[in-house]
Amino acid sequence: MSMNRFRETLQRATEEMQFELSGEQLRDFQLFAMELKKWNLRVNLTAITDDGEIAVKHIADSLFLARQLDSTERVLDVGSGAGIPAIPLKIAIPGLETVSVDAVGKKIHFQRHVARLLRLQGFQALHARIESLHATHGRSFDVITSRAFSDLGLFVRLTAPLLAEGGRLIAMKGPAAGDEMEEAKTTLAALRHEVCSLHPYRLPLESGERCLVVMRPVSKI
């Protein structure tokens, strides 16, 4: 890996975002990216392997979500894969209690390796199907997020039993999020959930458009 190129790209991206990172956070992101590329040679973790694209499309993208979170919240990342956004969120907000879940054991092994390497406290990677958490982690999370995991309806159906009172679901989507939201309206209504806000944004360095879709249970009033 070109350590300098990754670091320079991430610094340029976060400067454009006006998201300040400490030297230690930059180092941790760099180590994460290095391990991601190394493990990806033998485990299918990501299709994004260019140093600059890892900096922007994995790290910077996760930082837009970090702006929606509070360090006192407990967060679940569903279908976490290589630990994205869970690990970048944990690096960006050290006090955030973070749990990731994925059904592929090798991906969870990678996440646990990175957590040990970076000495992440308050981070847990679970090898499980999301449905299996209903019995053990019901109503446990303030925020549940996913990136490229499923459509909005299935995301809500699988995660709603895990959401704490007053919590919210945040789906990381592409530029067609509005269309997907319209398609999911009937399903969301049947599940007694609603979209409460959309947060469209542009990735730095002209790297594409994304959108955060925030959903909550419908008030029982």
From Swiss-Prot:
Keywords: Cytoplasm, Methyltransferase, rRNA processing, S-adenosyl-L-methionine, Transferase. It holds the Pfam family GidB. GO terms for cellular component: cytosol. Its main location: cytoplasm. It is an enzyme of class 2 (transferase). S-adenosyl-L-methionine binds at G79, I130, E131, R147. It comes from the Bacteria. CDD domains: AdoMet_MTases (cd02440). The keyword rRNA processing applies. Its EC number is 2.1.1.170. PANTHER family: S-ADENOSYL-L-METHIONINE-DEPENDENT METHYLTRANSFERASES SUPERFAMILY PROTEIN (PTHR31760:SF0). This is Ribosomal RNA small subunit methyltransferase G. It comes from Pelobacter propionicus (strain DSM 2379 / NBRC 103807 / OttBd1). The lineage of its organism: Bacteria, Pseudomonadati, Thermodesulfobacteriota, Desulfuromonadia, Desulfuromonadales.
